[in-house]
Amino acid sequence: MGAIETQGFKLDDSGRRIVVDPVTRIEGHMRCEVNVDANNVIRNAVSTGTMWRGLEVILKGRDPRDAWAFVERICGVCTGCHALTSVRAVEDALGIRIPKNAHLIREMMAKTLQVHDHAVHFYHLHALDWVDVVSALKADPKKTSELQHLVSPSHPLSSPGYFPRRGRTGLKKFVESGQLGPFMNGYWGSKAYVLPPEANLMAVTHYLEALDLQKEWVKVHAIFGGKNPHPNYLVGGVPCAINLDGNGAAGRINMERLNFVKARIDEMIEFNKNVYLPDVLAIGTIYKQAGWLHGGGLSALNVADYGTYDKVAYDHATHQLPGGVILDGNWDEIHAIDPRDPEQVQEFVAHSWYQYADESKGLHPWDGVTEPKFELGARTKGTRTAIEHIDESAKYSWIKSPRWRGHAVEVGPLSRYILGYAHALKGNKYCQRVKEQVDFAAEAINHAIPKALGLPETQYTLKQLLPTTIGRTLARCLEGQYCGEMMLADYHELVANIRAGDTATANVEKWDPATWPKEAKGVGTVAAPRGMLGHWIRIKDGKIENYQCVVPTTWNGSPRDAKGQIGAFEASLLGTPMVNPEQPVEILRTLHSFDPCLACSTHVMSEDGRELTTVKVR
């Protein structure tokens, strides 16, 4: 390949090649290869999806009312979001509108997922890319308590005695036993970690707090959807009946269950306020002071989202996280996005292991084709079953390349927050809270926290802070906080609506396929934890004729397209300096900021296949 330029990025594969395989994700496994120059700066990145999902093919010929139960199994971590997207697609195709109670319950379930997923992602999957666990053993509990008071004065669990009891004692037992358990395979002691021991102990302690709380929060799904993971959904509404007096069938929603939900919402809000946000701000500030403002990639240029969280059901103008597309980093211009428009959302396969009749052109998901074609390029090193070095000039991924009007875009909480901030600047009253959150966080990172910690204050602009790995992690945290607040409003609206006499939770007027048109097509969208999610369905003679999912990681993890444009994963790694390529903390730090969901052991190899070290990717 040599040196080329695309989208303003310079790619050069002449340096040393490092392979991380597999990086596990929701849709399967991801492989990542990078080239580093003589200064250990990443100059080329190649993201490969190494497993074919194929659920679109499985759905053909099935009853569209059952589709949600199949597609929900795409993922057990962001559980429910595919089911919700699916029922919305079917309802859109058939012209079904759900009752107000069903809308509010679905909103609460979706926001519960966001709060839960974002907290679990940060503490249990991503924080250890920033936090040196073993260093926490050196922390002074009194200084840790003082640090906690500085960054979160209102958190009640902050006494000097709490941190040894809750965090350090258990961690010490792990280390002394020689079995680090969940902390195995880390690069503890690497110079890529810059937090002081006290910050590390604070974060490890909160890791354990989050582990306790997350199992309580998902009970909201069990109340409204019957179980977690994979709560139940229903075309036309939700499967739970309402009876505030507690009479009738078991499982009906009564005030006891609603009070339980309220208690969980309060916990979420308090945790985000007192623990999650202060931790992210403190960690982000310290790393920013160390000059770690890498990983922005496409987020500095092109971001997109369909928009979500209608304040008024079916009124997209009331989205509390409005959608759109921003191109070339121009926050002053927001392009409208329409998932129905065949010229807007298209998937390309020039570098994907699929085949189209004309691979220079993209297909809209309603016309999507999922026909596998596994072949390796001439420059591939290894065999079909043991690839050492992928050839990115040919087909190299099971992920397609979705594009918006031909542009590669980043999706996810950071994209939603950049869009929300831009909309707020234009006077959108439904997302002013986004601007408040971002302005607060920027002031804290530039001024309040440095001042409290005795560090120099800074003057970074939002365009310097947000489009970074730190900004991506911060946006996820802010979205969790916002979702908890919105969920509380949804709860009060639901209770008031029920008390006013409305107990309807489903619209079954079009449940019978005899009421359906001979042919119909629809689209459903959801703000999944990792970004904008869309399902497109075609129904013919009461059965699914075609079904296509374009998931967040398809956007972010896409390979190059016919024009040579790289995706968000690949772009985010470019220009990142590595302290030690044999301990690739920086690669994991940025990849994890996109929220890969599952965990497995991976190996880092040199170009000749020699194993350098073992990497733990979560």
UniProtKB/Swiss-Prot annotation:
The keyword Secreted is assigned to this record: no
InterPro entries: Ni-dep_hyd_lsu (IPR001501), Ni-dep_hyd_lsu_Ni_BS (IPR018194), NiFe-Hase_large (IPR029014), NiFe/NiFeSe_hydrgnase_LSU (IPR050867)
Record-listed E.C. numbers: 1.12.99.6
Swiss-Prot/TrEMBL cofactor(s): Ni(2+)
Textual note on the cofactor: Binds 1 nickel ion per subunit.
Membrane-topology annotation of the record: Peripheral membrane protein
Chain residues that bind Ni(2+): 75, 78, 597, 600
Gene Ontology CC terms, in alphabetical order: plasma membrane
Catalysed reaction equations from the record: H2 + A = AH2
Subcellular location: Cell membrane
Coiled coil: none
Enzyme's top EC category: oxidoreductase
One of the record's GO molecular function terms: nickel cation binding
UniProt keyword list: Cell membrane, Membrane, Metal-binding, Nickel, Oxidoreductase
Highest taxon above the source species: Bacteria
Family under the similarity heading: Belongs to the [NiFe]/[NiFeSe] hydrogenase large subunit family.
Function: This enzyme recycles the H(2) produced by nitrogenase to increase the production of ATP and to protect nitrogenase against inhibition or damage by O(2) under carbon- or phosphate-limited conditions.
Quaternary state and interactors: Heterodimer of a large and a small subunit.
Protein name per the record: Uptake hydrogenase large subunit
Organism per entry: Rubrivivax gelatinosus
